[in-house]
Amino acid sequence: MNALQEDTPPGPSTVFRPPTSSRPLETPHCEIRIGIAGITITLSLCGCANARAPTLRSATADSSESTGFKNAPDLRTDQPKPPSKKRSCDPSEYRVSELKENLITTTPSRPRTARRCIRL
């Protein structure tokens, strides 16, 4: 058996050589360009399929200082938190709210303890 066979997938003892022809390859290819800090890396992939993958932010290699398109939403900004409900330190107000809660709930619950308010 010849160790160098054409059109044979690689196996444990064979070396794969792709078929050669006189006409240029007609398979589709695509390029992927990655720009990081002024360095551009171009990957050329032969025989790949085109797939669209939308991204939220992108920057070109020519203007790496750019943060992306003007219309792209910026998801890095923190959303403002809703205002928290202020608790009263007055024990009489706490007792009234506790009685209201007891009227609403019908299931028995453990007794509540008063919370201390610490002001800095």
Curated annotation (Swiss-Prot):
Residue ranges, compositional bias (Basic and acidic residues): 87-101
Region ranges (Disordered):
1-27, 56-120
Superkingdom of this protein's organism? Viruses
Biased composition regions of type Polar residues, renumbered to the chain? 57-69
Cellular compartment(s): Host nucleus
Q: Which GO terms describe its biological process?
A: symbiont-mediated activation of host apoptosis; symbiont-mediated perturbation of host exit from mitosis
The family note in this entry says: Belongs to the gyrovirus apoptin family.
What's the protein name? Apoptin
Recorded name of the encoding gene = VP3
